[in-house]
Regions:
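His/Asp/Glu-rich mid-to-C-terminal helical/loop segments that flank catalytic regions of hydrolases
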Residues: 250-284
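Intrinsic-disorder-associated, low-complexity terminal segments enriched in Asp/Asn/His/Tyr and depleted
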Residues: 3, 7, 13, 17-18
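Mid-sequence, gly/pro-rich, charge-dense loop/helix-turn segments that line enzyme active sites
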Residues: 113-216
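A C-terminal functional module that forms or caps the active site or interfaces directly
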Residues: 199-251
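Structural motif
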Residues: 102-104
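Glycine-rich phosphate-binding loop signature in dinucleotide/nucleotide-binding domains
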Residues: 96-99, 236-238
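N-terminal short beta-loop-beta anion/metal-coordinating cradle
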Residues: 26-92, 98
Length: 284
């Protein structure tokens, strides 16, 4: 027994310091692979934190990472910060430091598509940076050295999110309550699948909105982070998907109180989607 215990401690010591062992194992066998859930603002993540009974906080690079469990899954919740640079830093930390096995972004966005309205949900199948332009060296929107302008969402994750979003919209009176639905005029919100675009500016004028609609007619919604996450996840071969709640039409006609919408609608959407999604997944 003493020899066996000594051998085990010996192995652990070597794993800790990343030295090759005599047993056929690698460091990754001893490293957990949590699921990361990300939002840009605290209001989008607040309801999720309430669902995790055992969360504890770790701070890295000025960010608070909340580690815990939900439906048997190890989960990390984090605010990415607003904008593509902040998003890229957060994505890299999740992968390099926390060894995230997959990343899902939940939050709000401005609607661009013709029939994309306030209260609708958009599950992205692809991502593009609408403010990336290195022409004439490369075609507009193309990411230098990659030869592409869009990065794809993980098909399996996107499909799972679609299924859950359909259920959430069907149960909306229970998720939000009739009072919130009435207050924000949410009658029959729809689910959309398609292109999500990101850029380092808050699109809030009709002129900007129309320009994006003209240049990128296939875009369903616009925000400021997901395309950066998609590129980093592509680099590391980590599955990524995003679901966005439409908070406005990204133009001059926005009449919704954003903070109220965030607390009474978007945060409940995010919590319900993630809760139902993880409850359906088999815990590893």
């Amino acid at each position: 027994m003493a020899d066996k215990l000594t051998y085990t401690l010996y192995d652990v010591y070597y794993v800790k310091y990343y030295i090759i062992q005599t047993k056929p194992m690698t460091v990754k066998h001893f490293i957990s692979k949590p699921i990361a859930i990300v939002s840009a603002m605290h209001g989008e993540l607040s309801q999720l934190l309430a669902l995790m009974p055992d969360e504890h906080k770790q701070t890295r690079a000025g960010r608070e990472f909340w580690v815990g469990h939900l439906h048997g899954h190890e989960v990390i919740l984090v605010l990415s910060g607003i904008g593509k640079v902040a998003a890229a830093t957060t994505a890299t930390l999740l992968i390099e430091h926390f060894h995230a096995s997959q990343i899902v972004f939940t939050g709000v966005a401005g609607g661009l598509g013709k029939n994309v309205n306030v209260g609708d949900l958009v599950v992205a199948d692809s991502f593009l940076q609408h403010d990336l332009d290195v022409s004439p060296l490369f075609p507009k929107y193309q990411v230098p050295s990659y030869g592409v302008s869009t990065f794809q969402a993980d098909t399996q994750l996107a499909t799972e999110l679609q299924q859950v979003c359909t259920q959430v919209l069907r149960d909306l009176p229970h998720v939000l309550g009739h009072q919130a639905m009435t207050a924000f005029g949410l009658k029959q919100p729809k689910l959309h699948l398609g292109l999500l675009i990101s850029g380092d500016r808050f699109v809030s004028t009709t002129a900007e909105c129309q320009k994006l609609q003209q240049d990128l007619p296939q875009a369903l919604a616009v925000e400021m982070e997901s395309a950066a996450f998609a590129q980093v996840c592509h680099d590391y071969n980590v599955p990524f998907a995003a679901v966005r709640t439409i908070s406005d039409r990204a133009d001059d006609d926005a009449t919704v109180d954003f903070n109220r919408f965030l607390s009474q609608v978007a945060s409940h959407y995010s919590a319900s989607i993630v809760d139902k999604w993880l409850s359906k997944r088999k815990a590893s």
